[in-house]
């Protein structure tokens, strides 16, 4: 006979180890409703206080994965690989990474999310493109992933439904920041998508959800160990998010930035370093390249030849967007009516910025949601964001605000200028790739 939910809660509350059958039974109850909201909340709090070892976390991840549909890509000839980012400001990496890796021979069926807090969402960015369907039929999703090599869509209700219920409960019970629960939440959705290898981009800094280096490494290590324990080859990069990654933040503006990158216009930037490092990890994990140097050379080749841009355009068209989108993006991406420069308040070097607040400025412009049902203004945001370490003269633009009207542009420009520190001495450059983690 299965153990009662309250006995499982008691066992974890007292710091004892749960076996896989107990965890699977409890998560089945979360899914079918036989475990009450109060019991699920108590379980989450017990895990928050007592933690879980790797085997427990693997069992929790697999139980949540198996709570709904799981995708099977075994009929595809291409190796299946995916990437997940913990989120930041100006982080449009998925938009370039998927077509680059696809052009190198992998399949990237990427299930992405919307904006969360101050961070932008890949789906919101793609919805800047007229006609792009983030919820295609399963058949179309599979066909595009196979024939184009990449397809970026939204999560369906059938993937990891236990996570959806448990996350909603964690959100209102102060248990969001539990490493085992974060790990299982992220990985259950990724594993349900049927991938065979995964690369994680775990952000660190004042523009990420994790600001403490030690805590960030604990989360990255947990994700890597649990995913590998669940049978998916996984590695992680910890990357710097103490400034926006791209030089744009906002939905249509980040699509424009993506196209500029795919045209080869962002070589050598922090964004380029992250894209290439993740592409190399993915290609090695997929077995397409033997080592990172070979993988990066492949990625650079398809970027330079235009093959990656071609894949992006094909993905957009096959998922409902314009056939000539990459050739004529200006004809399709809406433009904000008010654009205003943000002038530097003095001469000197940009030494730091409040990245999270830059993300919140985009939300205040209408580029993100305060309430779940808010409509997004895809036109608005920030461009021309100067990287830290740049020497500027007084009055020189350090960013441009794109707003729905002039008064809003002026208000946000006044705020943005206060978010940057300028000093006489050039700051030390932070490496954008902080560290790499692999299993073992």
UniProtKB/Swiss-Prot annotation:
GO terms for biological process: pyrimidine nucleobase metabolic process; thymidine metabolic process. The enzymes which catalyze the reversible phosphorolysis of pyrimidine nucleosides are involved in the degradation of these compounds and in their utilization as carbon and energy sources, or in the rescue of pyrimidine bases for nucleotide synthesis. Keywords: Glycosyltransferase, Transferase. GO terms for cellular component: cytosol. Pathway: Pyrimidine metabolism; dTMP biosynthesis via salvage pathway; dTMP from thymine: step 1/2. Coiled coil: none annotated. The gene is deoA. This is Thymidine phosphorylase. It comes from Rhizobium meliloti (strain 1021). It is an enzyme of class 2 (transferase). GO terms for molecular function: 1,4-alpha-oligoglucan phosphorylase activity; thymidine phosphorylase activity. It comes from the Bacteria. SMART domains: PYNP_C. Belongs to the thymidine/pyrimidine-nucleoside phosphorylase family. Pfam families: Glycos_trans_3N, Glycos_transf_3, PYNP_C. Its EC number is 2.4.2.4. NCBIfam families: PRK05820.1 (NF004490), T_phosphoryl (TIGR02643), Y_phosphoryl (TIGR02644). It catalyses: thymidine + phosphate = 2-deoxy-alpha-D-ribose 1-phosphate + thymine. The keyword Transferase applies. Homodimer.
């Amino acid at each position: 006979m299965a153990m009662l939910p309250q006995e499982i809660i008691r066992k974890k509350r007292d710091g004892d180890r749960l076996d896989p059958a107990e965890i699977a039974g409890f998560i089945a109850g979360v899914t079918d409703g036989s475990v009450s909201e109060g019991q699920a909340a108590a379980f989450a709090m017990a895990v928050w206080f007592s933690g879980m070892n790797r085997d427990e976390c693997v069992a929790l991840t697999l139980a949540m994965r198996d709570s709904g549909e799981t995708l099977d890509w075994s009929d595809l000839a291409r190796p299946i690989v995916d990437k997940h980012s913990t989120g930041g400001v100006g982080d449009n990496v998925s938009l370039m990474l998927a077509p680059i890796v696809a052009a190198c021979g992998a399949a990237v069926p990427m299930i992405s999310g919307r904006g969360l807090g101050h961070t932008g969402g890949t789906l919101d960015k793609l919805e800047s493109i007229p006609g792009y369907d983030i919820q295609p039929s399963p058949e179309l999703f599979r066909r595009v992933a196979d024939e184009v090599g990449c397809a970026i869509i939204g999560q369906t209700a059938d993937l990891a439904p236990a996570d959806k219920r448990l996350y909603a409960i964690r959100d209102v019970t102060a248990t969001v920041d539990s490493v085992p629960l974060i790990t299982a939440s992220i990985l259950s959705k990724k594993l349900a998508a049927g991938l065979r290898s995964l690369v994680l981009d775990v952000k660190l800094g004042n523009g990420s959800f994790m600001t403490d280096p030690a805590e960030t490494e604990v989360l990255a290590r947990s994700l890597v160990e649990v995913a590998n324990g669940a049978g998916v080859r996984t590695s992680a990069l910890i990357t710097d998010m103490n400034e926006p990654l791209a030089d744009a933040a906002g939905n249509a503006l980040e699509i424009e930035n993506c196209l500029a990158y795919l045209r080869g216009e962002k070589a050598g930037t922090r964004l380029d370093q992250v894209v290439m490092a993740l592409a190399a990890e993915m290609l090695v994990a997929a077995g397409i390249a033997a080592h990172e140097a070979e993988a990066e050379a492949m990625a650079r080749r398809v970027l330079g030849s235009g093959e990656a841009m071609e894949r992006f355009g094909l993905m957009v068209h096959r998922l409902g967007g314009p056939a000539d989108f990459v050739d004529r993006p200006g004809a399709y991406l809406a433009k904000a009516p008010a654009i205003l420069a943000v002038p530097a308040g003095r001469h000197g070097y940009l030494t730091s910025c409040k990245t999270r607040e830059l993300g919140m400025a985009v939300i205040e412009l209408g580029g993100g949601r305060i309430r779940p049902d808010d409509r997004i203004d895809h036109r608005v945001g920030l461009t021309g964001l100067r990287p830290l370490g740049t020497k500027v003269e007084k009055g020189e633009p350090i960013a441009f605000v794109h707003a729905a009207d002039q008064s809003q542009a002026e208000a946000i420009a006044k705020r943005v200028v206060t978010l940057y520190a300028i000093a006489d001495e050039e700051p030390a450059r932070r490496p954008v790739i902080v560290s790499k983690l692999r299993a073992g």
